[in-house]
């Protein structure tokens, strides 16, 4: 083995990316970018361990994609994400890269590994080819270098270097600050960092997302409860009962949430909003759906349509179907034509037929966010 751990940093918020999906979750065919980058680099060498950092909100979901990596909750900053990851590193050396460096070539990885014992930090750099101006003065561009990742460091030296309140933008800066030895090697233009959304077309290794569709179903049922308002699809219905539930009991929204989570393979509503958590007691279900729609978009999907079946003896649903469609379209951020609402009774059979509650069955269809068309 190499005695090297690979860390791939994927916990950022993509605030400058200007796409509805976070950069680490855009699809390359059927793979999220973080998985594509991790598999690509790990194919170039036999690392002792591979660590992937994730935003806390996406950590459990990310674990669904592979059992071959160690997933670690990222920090508020790049440096904190590295510190969190270093707790799981036992090798002498560590190679750290950013998911934004999507097309790092094999030659860079091999050159880093070949030089691992020659300095405390091995750093790929590029010469500057454009004219450089600093504070209105043109400076000698031969003295300016562009620092890239991945970088390969001595694990212990890096731990010592990051044990400071000072924030560094890369490992070499931190190690240089404690007088560590830095060695520069030739970088690559293919290791360009993806920061802005319009830079996607400059990365030749990225293929467009597939045209696959993903379908999920949801089902929820709630009994009636006195002295409570009834909400269905975010619409307040004039009925004498509400729904018995930990939240406001909007059975339609709860069903849709499960359908959305099912379509992207992210579990169910109870995993995101457990009914044992007091912060969700009496909560407006529209807020819960908003969080799920944000999650769906963040991890690379767009909502195509939903088909909703409300099963109720009472109240009568037909007079409110159009209002429910409008409400759900707004909440799901899709056009009204892509929301279908059906209503049926239980023919006076069972719990629902005795007018003791309402059930809703939902089907949701998703597709990958197509960054190629933006």
Swiss-Prot record:
A divalent metal cation binds at residues 220, 222, 254. Its EC number is 2.7.7.60, 4.6.1.12. This is Bifunctional enzyme IspD/IspF. The record marks 16, 23, 246, 345 as: Transition state stabilizer. Keywords: Isoprene biosynthesis, Lyase, Metal-binding, Multifunctional enzyme, Nucleotidyltransferase, Transferase. Pfam families: IspD, YgbB. 4-CDP-2-C-methyl-D-erythritol 2-phosphate binds at residues 220-222, 246-247, 268-270, 273-277, 344-347, 351, 354. GO terms for molecular function: 2-C-methyl-D-erythritol 2,4-cyclodiphosphate synthase activity; 2-C-methyl-D-erythritol 4-phosphate cytidylyltransferase activity; metal ion binding. It catalyses: 2-C-methyl-D-erythritol 4-phosphate + CTP + H(+) = 4-CDP-2-C-methyl-D-erythritol + diphosphate; 4-CDP-2-C-methyl-D-erythritol 2-phosphate = 2-C-methyl-D-erythritol 2,4-cyclic diphosphate + CMP. The keyword Flavoprotein does not apply. Gene3D superfamilies: 2-C-methyl-D-erythritol 2,4-cyclodiphosphate synthase, Spore Coat Polysaccharide Biosynthesis Protein SpsA, Chain A. The record marks 141, 193 as: Positions MEP for the nucleophilic attack. GO terms for biological process: isopentenyl diphosphate biosynthetic process, methylerythritol 4-phosphate pathway; terpenoid biosynthetic process. Its cofactor is a divalent metal cation. Residues 214-374 are annotated as: 2-C-methyl-D-erythritol 2,4-cyclodiphosphate synthase. In the N-terminal section; belongs to the IspD/TarI cytidylyltransferase family. IspD subfamily. Pathway: Isoprenoid biosynthesis; isopentenyl diphosphate biosynthesis via DXP pathway; isopentenyl diphosphate from 1-deoxy-D-xylulose 5-phosphate: step 2/6; Isoprenoid biosynthesis; isopentenyl diphosphate biosynthesis via DXP pathway; isopentenyl diphosphate from 1-deoxy-D-xylulose 5-phosphate: step 4/6. It comes from Aliarcobacter butzleri (strain RM4018) (Arcobacter butzleri). Bifunctional enzyme that catalyzes the formation of 4-diphosphocytidyl-2-C-methyl-D-erythritol from CTP and 2-C-methyl-D-erythritol 4-phosphate (MEP) (IspD), and catalyzes the conversion of 4-diphosphocytidyl-2-C-methyl-D-erythritol 2-phosphate (CDP-ME2P) to 2-C-methyl-D-erythritol 2,4-cyclodiphosphate (ME-CPP) with a corresponding release of cytidine 5-monophosphate (CMP) (IspF). Residues 1-213 are annotated as: 2-C-methyl-D-erythritol 4-phosphate cytidylyltransferase.
């Amino acid at each position: 083995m190499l005695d090297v751990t690979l860390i791939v940093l994927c916990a950022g918020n993509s605030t400058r990316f200007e796409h509805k999906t976070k950069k680490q979750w855009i699809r390359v065919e059927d793979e999220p970018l973080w998985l594509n980058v991790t598999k690509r680099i790990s194919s170039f060498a036999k690392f002792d361990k591979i660590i992937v950092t994730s935003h806390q909100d996406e950590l459990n979901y990310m674990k669904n994609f592979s059992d071959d990596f160690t997933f670690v909750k990222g920090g508020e900053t790049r440096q904190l994400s590295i510190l969190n990851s270093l707790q799981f590193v036992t090798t002498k050396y560590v190679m750290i890269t950013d998911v934004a460096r999507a097309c790092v070539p094999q030659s860079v990885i091999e050159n880093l590994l070949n030089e691992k014992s020659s300095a405390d930090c091995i750093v790929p750099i590029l010469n500057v080819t454009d004219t450089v101006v600093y504070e209105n003065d043109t400076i000698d561009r031969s003295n300016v270098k562009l620092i890239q990742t991945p970088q390969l460091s001595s694990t212990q030296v890096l731990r010592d270097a990051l044990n400071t309140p000072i924030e560094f933008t890369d490992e070499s800066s931190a190690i240089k600050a404690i007088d560590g030895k830095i060695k520069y090697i030739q970088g690559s233009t293919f290791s360009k960092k993806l920061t802005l959304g319009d830079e996607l077309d400059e990365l030749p290794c990225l293929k467009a997302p597939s045209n696959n569709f993903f379908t999920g179903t949801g089902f929820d049922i709630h009994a009636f409860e006195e002295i409570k308002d009834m909400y269905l699809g975010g619409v307040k219905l004039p009925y004498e009962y509400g729904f018995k539930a930990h939240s406001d009991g909007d059975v339609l929204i709860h069903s849709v949430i499960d359908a959305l989570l099912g379509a992207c393979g992210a579990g169910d509503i109870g995993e995101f909003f457990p009914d044992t958590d007091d912060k969700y007691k009496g909560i407006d279900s529209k807020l819960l759906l908003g969080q799920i729609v944000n999650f769906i978009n963040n991890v690379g999907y767009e909502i195509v349509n939903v088909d909703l079946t409300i099963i109720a003896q009472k109240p009568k649903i037909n007079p409110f179907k159009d209002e429910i469609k409008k409400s759900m379209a707004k909440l799901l951020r899709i056009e009204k034509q892509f929301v279908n609402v059906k209503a049926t009774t239980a023919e006076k059979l069972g719990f629902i037929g005795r007018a003791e509650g309402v059930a809703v069955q939902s089907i949701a269809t998703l597709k990958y966010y197509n960054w190629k068309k933006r």
